[in-house]
Amino acid sequence: MPKFFCDYCDVYLTHDSMSVRKAHNSGRNHLRNVVDYYQQIGHEKAQSVIDSITSSYAAEGQAHANPMLPQNQPGQGFPPPPFGFPGGIPPPFPGMPGAPPGQFPQGMPPPPGGGRGMPPMPPFPPGPNGMPVPPNGLPFPPPGGFPFPPPGAPGAPGAPGASGGAPPPFPGLPGMPPPGQGFPPGGPPGFAPPGAGAPGHEKR
């Protein structure tokens, strides 16, 4: 059977198996040898790594100082702003509360498009009577400063028939009672209530 050589400890293990390797690798001598090995490499190689990093920074700095490179030509600053917006900053959506010019309200991401040469996205369509669209899918406030209707009332948010609310149930589903009526005593047809056995069998 082949033997396994540990580079850190400079020893051959009795044989090459997972159990022998695992036992050797968890031993304190092996762990101490691994730490010593990497500390020795760290001291020897640290200066060479530092020298290579500083030389790469020095070479990069000299490359940027070259006046013949395109990025160092006069008049080459930032790319031109995308068309449609002066200065490249898209305006906030019309009617957005708390949006100072050139900025968006906190928690609102900027609109997609309008950058990297893409045309700007059109603004959201206004709500009823020219009002801005409420944020986060909230319902429109009632006109004239009236209070919201109580929950469950017609026209209340989430009430059946209200826009954005739950749709009314579909009529005429097989096995369902007419709207407004419950199931007859005993439950729906073909359904036995809990505790009742199959028809014709009695509980003992």
UniProtKB/Swiss-Prot annotation:
Q: Provide the Gene Ontology terms for cellular component.
A: commitment complex; U1 snRNP; U2-type prespliceosome
Matrin-type zinc finger span = 4-36
> Could you say which protein family the record assigns here?
Belongs to the U1 small nuclear ribonucleoprotein C family.
Q: Where is the composition biased (Pro residues)?
A: 77-154, 166-192
The protein depicted here goes by the name U1 small nuclear ribonucleoprotein C
List, alphabetically, the InterPro entries matched. Matrin/U1-C_Znf_C2H2 (IPR000690), Matrin/U1-like-C_Znf_C2H2 (IPR003604), U1-CZ_Znf_C2H2 (IPR013085), U1_snRNP-C (IPR017340), Znf_C2H2_sf (IPR036236)
Organism of derivation: Fusarium vanettenii (strain ATCC MYA-4622 / CBS 123669 / FGSC 9596 / NRRL 45880 / 77-13-4) (Fusarium solani subsp. pisi)
Any one Pfam family match given in the protein's UniProt record, by short name: zf-U1
Q: Where in the cell is it found?
A: Nucleus
Q: How does it assemble?
A: U1 snRNP is composed of the 7 core Sm proteins B/B', D1, D2, D3, E, F and G that assemble in a heptameric protein ring on the Sm site of the small nuclear RNA to form the core snRNP, and at least 3 U1 snRNP-specific proteins U1-70K, U1-A and U1-C. U1-C interacts with U1 snRNA and the 5' splice-site region of the pre-mRNA.
Q: Which UniProt keywords apply?
A: Metal-binding, Nucleus, Ribonucleoprotein, RNA-binding, Zinc, Zinc-finger
Q: Where is this region: Disordered?
A: 65-204
Question: What one GO molecular function would you report for this record?
Answer: pre-mRNA 5'-splice site binding
Query: What is known about what this protein does?
Result: Component of the spliceosomal U1 snRNP, which is essential for recognition of the pre-mRNA 5' splice-site and the subsequent assembly of the spliceosome. U1-C is directly involved in initial 5' splice-site recognition for both constitutive and regulated alternative splicing. The interaction with the 5' splice-site seems to precede base-pairing between the pre-mRNA and the U1 snRNA. Stimulates commitment or early (E) complex formation by stabilizing the base pairing of the 5' end of the U1 snRNA and the 5' splice-site region.
Q: Does the keyword field hold Zinc?
A: yes
Q: What GO biological process, any one, is recorded here? A: mRNA 5'-splice site recognition
- Note the superkingdom of the native organism: Eukaryota
- Whether RNA-binding counts among this entry's keywords is yes
The cross-references to PANTHER family, in alphabetical order and at most eight, read:
U1 SMALL NUCLEAR RIBONUCLEOPROTEIN C
